[in-house]
Structure formats: structure tokens, C-alpha cells
């Protein structure tokens, strides 16, 4: 009957064994059939020499390690049946660890170290800060909240460790050699704190090799060679826990909370994400030289993609604008056969006259031209000289900026007059007025009567402004010796029906040339489409080349993250000991990879804009597009996350006790 009223133990071990080795290595059994029960309100000391198995027993009690065999029940739950998140809940909500080596995160302040369990518990920031400051003040560290571990003495670090253990309540304090690394005065202070916690109703499990320290406990369990050799439990166990213990530490209460609260607390992910961002920034800043080298790959990759695409888009827009400036209703006819094996045809003046009669045609302009030497004074200059009719300004949408264009009378009389392009004017006359001056074209004098408006390059192979327009008749008689045009420019009557006009011209030419297709027809719209396709292909190629450097940057992220995981293995163990789930660790390191990518991406965009500005000063066509910038940044972020996932997953899968033991 007495047993029926006995409270259910918080912790109950039955025949716990722990073995290491196997798989080709010698097997060592560290714990050999350990059985014990611990109730609410107990202050227990587990004492034993070094290597006796007491620390291994503590790791199993705190769910940092799993036994090889036997059963461990916590608050009536079989711990072996709990998944990793449920065991993390126990470490976060039920246990508080005080380690011999303090196990504080070096890059975090005292307050940030204390707050860590509360972050994983999803406690709001304001409440978290208040509670952490209150605990540190209670432990005499009110003036040390912003100090990092290396700025604290050993005793102060251990008090920070105790404050951290109490952050989420610290119902069960697991203290592993808490005085082992301290001087006698600091050790006495720590033991006084543990006595105080025990008197307040916390379960305190003290792991020590010092029998004088163990004597402070109400119950002493001696472990030797992995076995319990003595246990004072029968006489020393308190019969009635305090009111605080009744409220917080009864097994059935913790059992219910475990069943309800092992999932991620509401809102915890926000706190954890903010903490992950802050931690990532701290690590990046502390290792800023290494971070800068890693970021360099991402920066170069993003900048390359953005600049390459901007140059490609700028070139495309420039070419499209310049080609479109000549009109989208333009059709070109030449004597070049589309069949390279066929003989070259001749487009005659009769063909031109016949085309002009078609209803689908608005204007027809034969062109007889070529690259010739032009002289003014002692300046010789090569320019394209084209014999055209008076429809030139209208067909090509190319007005005269200075002077006038030649007339039908000039055409009929084969008058030697010339309208020069903007570039020719600059080269031959500089700032002087060219109107009325004479130039020599192939030693034939022509009087300049006008200057064409600046037009720009047509397609990159000829400079449209580097040309001279003269009457077609004068060009045929004085310069080229033939009335047959080099090619014909035709303006369709309707810009929306250019293809119909092209078909009508094709049918007419086939009839005039007796079914022989010894000519070639192209229209400006088709040329623009073809050029656009070419430019798109070029942009894609440039972007692909640049993307390779972005890929290299991603590999750099993976490399640095793998190195970070190796260097911060103990920190990962500390986070797990304070209640971090595997998902929390994964989120932490993925956030760091994302931070690297975000900072590198933003810096890459800034560098790209600077390079673009320099290129614009150098008269290079550059057109930044929001889609290219967002795309490059997104690719950098995705690349960082993809390459950061493997290191993050490796970190999340670390064994807590092995991580804590790493150097």
C-alpha cells in the first residue's frame, strides 16, 4: 500500500548498458547494467573516479547520448521511443546543463548565451531579455551581460552556465564537475548556488570525483567501473517535495507537457531565424578576411552575370533602335541569288520601273554605291558614296540637318552635288560650315549642299553616318559607269503588310526574269527579327559564361560552410544541449549560407552598376534590366542555399555528445 502512494520517479533507469567500439575495433563496455530512480526534489551526487562511467551516465540522463541496451523512462515515457525533436524538448524544457568546461559560445555575449534555450523555446524577445538579465543579476553578473566568455573569469563563466541552465526553468540541473576547473573560492560559490537551487525545489544531479563536493548532496551514488556500488537513496530521499516542486516537477505534469509541447513552439521560428541571422553576421564579422575571400567568388559571379547581360541587352537595344530607325516597312532587293551556286543576277532599271507600278509599293529607290576615297583640301577619307534618288529622306526617315537635299532637277541633269553624313562632316570640316564647299570623290568635284542628321550605325558592319548621298544619275555616269543599281530599297505602302508586298515583288521579278530566282529579297522587319535572335543568343552565351563564375562562387560557399561546421562543432553541441532541434541547426547553417549569398549578391550588384557606369563613360551600350538583376541575385541565393545544404545537413546530423567533446 505504501508503494501505491509512492510518487512516480522523474527518472528511472533499468539495466542501462553503454558500449563503444565494434565493427572491427575492440568493444568496450562503459556502463554495466546501471539501475536507479530519481524523484522530484532530490539533490543527488554521482561520484566516481575518472573513467568510472559517471560522465557517460550523465550524458544518457540528459538525452545527449543513447544507451546500448536497457530502459530509460522519463516522467513515465520511454526515452527510446522519443524522436530527436522530443529529446530536444527534454533538453530544452526539463534539463539544464552545467559543464566543467562551461561550454559557452565564444562569439556570443553572456546575455546571449543565457538566452539561447529561450530562443529555441519560442519565448518573445522582450521576455527573454528581461529573464536573462534577472538571472545574471541574481548570480552577481549584472555588469557583465555584454561581456564575451573570454572577458570573464572561470567562476563568472560557470555562473553564466548556471544562468543558462535556469533560463527555461531548469527543473533538473545536470552539473558535470562544476567546480573542476575553478579555484576553491569560485568553486565554493558555485556549490552554494547549487545548494540554493536544490533548496528551491530543483532536482540537482551533481557529477563529481570529489567526495567533499559530493557530500553537499542529500543522496550519493557511487559508480565504479561502470557499475553502481553504493546508493544512499533509501535514507536520504525527501518524503515531501516543496510547493514549488509540486507545481513544477511532478512526473505526471512533465509527462503531460512532453506530450503536448515537443513540437516547435508557436512563433519560435521567428526568434530562431533572427538569432540565426545575428549569429551568422557575428561569424562573418569575426572571420571577415576569410568571409571576404568567399564573398569574392559570389561578387564576381553576380557582377559578371549582370554586366554581361546588360552589355548584351544594351547592344541589342542599340542595334534594334538603329535598324528600326530606317523603317520597318523597308524591303531590299539585290542581284545576289539565295542559291550560292547560281550565277549573280542583275537588277535593271526596267525592274525598278516595274516595281514602282505595284499597288503594294509606296516608293522605290535604286542605289548605286560603294566605298570611295573622298578628299577635302589635304584630307583624304574613306566613306560610303551612294547614288540615290530624291526619295532618300522619306524612305529611310533620314532628314537633312543642314542645307537641303538635291532635287529632281539635279537628278535629271546628273548634277554633281552631295549631301554628306554627320561623321563625314566632322572628319572633313570639323566645326566649319560645309555648305557650298567642294569635295573630290574619286577626283570628281562635288558641291556640298546639305548635311544629313546623325543616324548612327545600322548593323555594326557599316557606319550609316559615314556616307555621302549624291544623285543616282551622277553616281551612275561619273563614278560607277552603269545605270543598273547595286541594290534597290523599296518602301511598302502598308507597314502591316510588308510580307504581302514582298510576295508581290517576288512574283513580278520571277515573271520579269523568266522564272529564274537570280535575286534576293529581304525586309527590314525580318532583318530586325533575325538580329534580335542573334543578339538574344549572344546574351545567353555571355550570361552562361558568367554563370560559371557564379557556380564557382557557390562551391566557395560550400567549402567555407564545411570548414565552419568543422570549426564550430562544439558550438553545435552546445546548441543541441540547450534544446536545439536538428531542424534548428539546419536552419542556422542554411541562414549563414544565405547570408553569405545575400551579402555577396548585393555587393555583386553594386559592383555591376559601377562597372556599367564606367562602360557608359566609354561609350559602350549598357542596359541594366530589373529582371536580370533580380535573376542574378536569386541565382546567387539559390546557389548558396544549394551548396550550403550539405554542410548544414552535416551539422544537423551531428551527435550531441560527440560534438560537445570536439576540440
Curated annotation (Swiss-Prot):
One of its GO terms (biological process) is pyoverdine biosynthetic process. InterPro entries: AAA+_ATPase, ABC3_permease_C, ABC_transporter-like_ATP-bd, ABC_transporter-like_CS, MacB-like_ATP-bd, MacB_PCD, Macrolide_Exporter_MacB, P-loop_NTPase. The chain crosses the membrane at residues 292-312, 545-565, 598-618, 626-646. Residues 11-250 form the ABC transporter domain. Signal peptide: none annotated. It is an enzyme of class 7 (translocase). GO terms for molecular function: ATP binding; ATP hydrolysis activity; efflux transmembrane transporter activity; transmembrane transporter activity. Disruption phenotype: Mutant shows reduction of extracellular PVD levels and accumulates PVD in the periplasm. Mutant lacking PvdRT-OpmQ secretes PVD and can import ferri-PVD, but has an approximately 20-fold increase in the amount of PVD present in the periplasm. The pvdRT-opmQ deletion mutant also accumulates newly synthesized PVD in the periplasm. Mutant accumulates unwanted PVD-metal complexes. Induction: Expression is iron-regulated and under the tight control of the PVD-specific PvdS sigma factor. SUPFAM superfamilies: P-loop containing nucleoside triphosphate hydrolases. Part of the tripartite efflux system PvdRT-OpmQ required for the secretion into the extracellular milieu of the siderophore pyoverdine (PVD), which is involved in iron acquisition. This subunit binds PVD and drives its secretion by hydrolyzing ATP. The system is responsible for export of newly synthesized PVD after the final steps of biosynthesis have taken place in the periplasm. PANTHER family: MACROLIDE EXPORT ATP-BINDING_PERMEASE PROTEIN MACB, MEMBRANE COMPONENT OF TRANSPORTER-RELATED. Was originally thought to be involved only in PVD recycling. It was later shown to be involved in the secretion of both newly synthesized PVD and recycled PVD. Belongs to the ABC transporter superfamily. Macrolide exporter (TC 3.A.1.122) family. This is Pyoverdine export ATP-binding/permease protein PvdT. The lineage of its organism: Bacteria, Pseudomonadati, Pseudomonadota, Gammaproteobacteria, Pseudomonadales.
Amino acid at each position: 500500500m505504501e508503494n501505491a502512494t509512492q510518487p512516480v520517479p522523474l527518472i528511472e533507469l533499468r539495466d542501462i548498458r553503454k558500449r563503444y567500439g565494434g565493427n572491427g575495433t575492440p568493444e568496450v563496455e562503459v556502463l554495466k547494467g546501471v539501475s536507479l530512480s530519481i524523484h522530484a526534489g532530490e539533490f543527488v551526487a554521482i561520484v566516481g573516479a575518472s573513467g568510472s562511467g559517471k560522465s557517460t551516465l550523465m550524458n544518457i540522463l540528459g538525452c545527449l547520448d543513447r544507451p546500448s541496451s536497457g530502459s530509460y523512462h522519463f516522467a513515465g515515457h520511454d526515452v527510446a521511443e522519443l524522436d530527436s525533436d522530443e529529446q530536444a524538448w527534454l533538453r530544452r524544457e526539463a534539463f539544464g546543463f552545467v559543464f566543467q568546461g562551461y561550454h559557452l559560445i565564444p562569439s556570443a555575449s553572456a546575455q546571449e548565451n543565457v538566452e539561447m534555450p529561450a530562443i529555441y523555446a519560442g519565448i518573445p524577445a522582450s521576455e527573454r531579455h528581461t529573464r536573462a538579465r534577472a538571472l545574471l543579476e541574481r548570480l552577481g553578473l549584472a555588469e557583465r551581460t555584454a561581456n564575451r566568455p573570454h572577458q570573464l573569469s572561470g567562476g563568472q563563466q560557470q555562473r553564466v552556465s548556471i544562468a543558462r541552465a535556469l533560463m527555461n526553468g531548469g527543473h533538473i540541473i545536470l552539473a558535470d564537475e562544476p567546480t573542476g576547473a575553478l579555484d576553491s573560492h569560485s568553486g565554493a560559490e558555485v556549490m552554494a548556488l547549487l545548494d540554493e537551487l536544490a533548496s528551491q525545489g530543483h532536482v540537482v544531479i551533481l557529477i563529481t570525483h570529489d567526495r567533499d563536493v559530493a557530500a553537499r548532496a542529500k543522496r550519493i551514488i557511487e559508480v565504479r567501473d561502470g557499475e553502481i556500488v553504493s546508493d544512499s537513496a533509501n535514507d536520504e530521499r525527501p518524503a515531501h517535495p516543496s510547493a514549488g516542486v509540486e507545481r513544477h516537477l511532478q512526473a505526471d505534469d512533465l509527462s503531460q507537457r512532453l506530450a503536448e509541447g515537443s513540437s516547435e513552439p508557436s512563433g519560435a521560428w521567428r526568434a530562431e531565424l533572427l538569432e540565426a541571422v545575428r549569429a551568422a553576421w557575428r561569424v562573418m564579422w569575426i572571420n571577415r578576411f576569410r568571409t571576404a575571400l568567399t564573398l569574392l567568388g559570389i561578387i564576381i559571379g553576380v557582377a559578371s552575370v549582370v554586366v554581361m547581360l546588360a552589355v548584351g541587352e544594351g547592344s541589342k537595344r542599340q542595334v534594334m533602335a538603329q535598324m528600326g530607325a530606317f523603317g520597318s516597312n523597308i524591303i531590299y532587293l539585290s542581284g545576289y541569288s539565295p542559291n550560292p551556286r547560281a550565277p549573280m543576277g542583275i537588277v535593271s532599271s526596267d525592274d525598278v520601273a516595274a516595281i514602282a507600278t505595284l499597288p503594294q509599293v509606296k516608293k522605290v529607290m535604286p542605289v548605286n554605291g560603294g566605298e570611295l576615297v573622298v578628299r577635302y583640301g589635304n584630307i583624304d577619307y574613306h566613306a560610303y558614296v551612294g547614288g540615290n534618288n530624291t526619295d532618300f529622306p522619306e524612305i529611310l526617315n533620314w532628314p537633312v540637318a543642314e542645307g537641303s537635299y538635291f532635287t529632281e532637277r539635279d537628278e535629271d541633269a546628273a548634277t554633281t552635288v552631295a549631301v554628306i553624313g554627320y561623321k563625314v562632316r566632322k572628319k572633313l570640316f570639323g566645326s566649319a560650315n560645309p555648305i557650298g564647299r567642294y569635295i573630290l570623290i574619286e577626283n570628281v568635284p562635288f558641291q556640298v549642299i546639305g548635311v544629313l542628321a546623325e543616324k548612327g550605325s545600322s548593323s555594326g558592319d557599316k557606319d550609316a553616318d559615314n556616307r555621302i548621298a549624291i544623285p543616282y544619275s551622277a553616281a551612275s555616269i561619273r563614278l560607277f559607269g552603269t545605270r543598273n543599281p547595286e541594290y534597290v530599297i523599296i518602301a511598302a505602302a502598308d507597314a502591316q503588310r510588308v510580307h504581302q508586298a514582298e510576295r508581290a515583288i517576288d512574283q513580278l521579278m520571277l515573271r520579269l526574269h523568266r522564272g529564274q530566282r537570280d535575286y534576293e529579297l529581304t525586309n527590314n522587319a525580318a532583318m530586325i527579327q533575325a538580329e534580335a535572335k542573334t543578339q538574344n543568343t549572344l546574351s545567353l552565351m555571355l550570361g552562361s559564361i558568367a554563370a560559371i563564375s557564379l557556380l564557382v562562387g557557390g562551391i566557395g560557399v560550400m567549402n567555407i560552410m564545411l570548414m565552419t561546421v568543422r570549426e564550430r562543432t562544439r558550438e553545435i553541441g552546445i546548441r543541441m544541449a540547450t534544446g536545439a532541434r536538428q531542424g534548428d541547426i539546419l536552419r542556422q547553417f542554411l541562414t549563414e549560407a544565405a547570408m553569405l549569398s545575400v551579402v555577396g549578391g548585393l555587393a555583386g550588384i553594386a559592383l555591376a552598376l559601377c562597372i556599367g557606369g564606367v562602360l557608359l563613360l566609354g561609350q559602350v551600350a549598357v542596359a541594366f534590366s530589373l529582371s536580370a538583376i533580380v535573376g542574378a541575385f536569386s541565382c546567387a541565393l539559390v546557389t548558396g542555399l544549394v551548396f550550403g545544404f550539405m554542410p548544414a545537413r552535416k551539422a544537423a546530423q551531428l551527435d550531441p555528445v560527440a560534438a560537445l567533446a570536439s576540440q
